[in-house]
Amino acid sequence: MTQKTNAHTSEELKELQRYPLELKKQLTASRIRELDMKYDFYVSFSGGKDSAVAVDFTAKILKSLGRKRMYVLNINTGLEYLSVQRFVKLFCEYVSKKYDIEIILETAYPEMSFVDVIKQYGYPIISKEVSQCIYEARKGINPDGTLNGKYSYRYEKLNGTKLDKNGQLSQYNCPQYKFLLDSPIPVSHICCMKVKKDPAYVYEKRTGQIPLIATTCEESRNRKTAWLENGCNAFNCERPKSAPFSFWTNQDMLHYTYEEKMPIAGAYGSIAPKSAMNGQLNMFAELQVMDSCELCTTGCPRTGCVYCLFGITQDPDRILRLQEMEPKRADFVLRGGHFRESDGMWEPTKDGLGYWYVLDVLNENGIKVPYKNAELYRIAK
């Protein structure tokens, strides 16, 4: 069998990421034009800052091509910050007026609730990669604790013994998370599929459109791997899609938003020089030469699903922010939970999702995720 040749190398990605934003805009515009020539497409818009950039920039390019309308799909999972959910329609109206282009916004909803996903599959913890590893490793363990041979490579990764093709320990080994395998917490990567991707697939099948997404290689190893294999316009995949912002960085997204004077959802706060957040301004910030400053948001650095624990090691204060910004939702997330009689595994109850126990297990194993009023949620384990 002939081994597939990657579209790009890691060195090419690093070079692209170093390009100035103006050049990145030109490259992204060319990919959007290529997409427009070959496919009917929609822009996936969560209400987050990166997908807002995708909506704004794509509308600008389509307007320059003489297009009269642009299709936008929002998957309303019900899991985003309320300010993000409300922002979707308002921002589409803003872009439509800004570029004098019709924005046809459609909202889709998941068939399966988040609570049901957790009960049937498990909690999303650490990352998709780690959660999938835990989920599948458990399928390889018999009720008596012996291994049945299924997904043995997942078990090896959790033991830290998996070797790569060169006979070296794999970079994908994750023994630091084996405690999750040994815990009574069900863990799974399937939530995104059930809550986000399945509704998108239904829309795509009905309309014949393919998605333009705002994901970047900087966000995760899986997204970097996908770009290395297929490039921005992955037209030859089983599910064709375009990710024309793949080589943009978080700083690029922030600078574009600032330069365009775009509104952002309230959960982010505002965009400001990072030095100002530390109580001091550098020379460029004082002169308001913002293109030379490192920017940040004064609120959430990222939004996404507020109940999701993917990326929690990079953003450990996520639950604290939720407690401050939306205390009633935070209370439901933390409260409740019990051990199932059938197998002793932890699951949500009608009182809440039971995250207090999940966070306690993480904290006990060196992954510090603070939350307030812990004593109010804890029960006898």
Predicted regions mapped to residue ranges:
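ATP-dependent adenylation/nucleotidyltransferase module used to activate substrates
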Residues: T2-D252
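ATP/NTP-dependent adenylation/nucleotidyl-transfer catalytic domains that generate, transfer
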Residues: T2-K14, C237-E238, N250-K381
